[in-house]
C-alpha cells in the first residue's frame, strides 16, 4: 500500500499480459497490498450474466488467504498451487509477501527451473524453511521435487469434508477452497 499510487494506474497497465485489456484491482488487507490482475473477459461476462449480483474474487487472493495461517514471522516459505498444466508459485520471507506468479508447468524440470529462478532472484541458498502446496491432482514427481527444497512440506487441504454427488467429484472434496465461505 505504501508504494501504490492511484495516479500511476496507467503505468501498472503496461505490465499486464494484455495492456489493451482492462485490469482489475483487489486489496489484500492482511498483506497491506493492492493487487492488479486481468481475467477472461468472455468468461467473466458469462458469469455476470448468470449471477448479476455475484462478487468475483481472484483465485490468487484465495490462495494467499488459505496460506496465511502457515506463514511464520521468521524464515522463508514457498507456496505452490498446482492446476492442470500450470502452477501458481508464491514466496514469503520473514513473514513478508515477496512474490506471486503463474507458470506453465509440464514436468518436474519446469517446476525446478521456476523455483530455482525465484531462489536466485531473492537470494535463497539451499532450502526454504517450509513448502506449502495444494492441488486437486498433483503428479507425485512434483511432490517429490518439492521435498528437495525444504525439510517441511505441508499440503493445504480442506479441513472438513464436502458432500459428493458422484464418484468423479471425490477428488475435489479435499480442495482447500471448500473451507472458504460460499454464496447462498
Located regions from the model:
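Conserved aromatic-histidine-acidic binding/catalytic patches
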Residues: 35, 77, 103
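Accessory, usually C-terminal, subdomains that scaffold auxiliary metal cofactors
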Residues: 102-178
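Structural motif
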Residues: 37-38, 81-83, 132-138
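A structural signal for short, well-ordered beta-strand segments and their strand-loop junctions
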Residues: 56-57, 79, 155
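Short, surface-exposed amphipathic charged segments that create phosphate/polyanion-binding patches used
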Residues: 27-28, 70-73, 165-184
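Gly/Thr-rich phosphate-binding beta-strand-loop-beta motif of the actin/hexokinase/Hsp70
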Residues: 70-96
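Short small-residue beta-strand/loop micro-motif enriched in glycine and branched aliphatics
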Residues: 97-101
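Active-site neighborhood for divalent-cation/phosphate handling
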Residues: 1-69, 161-163
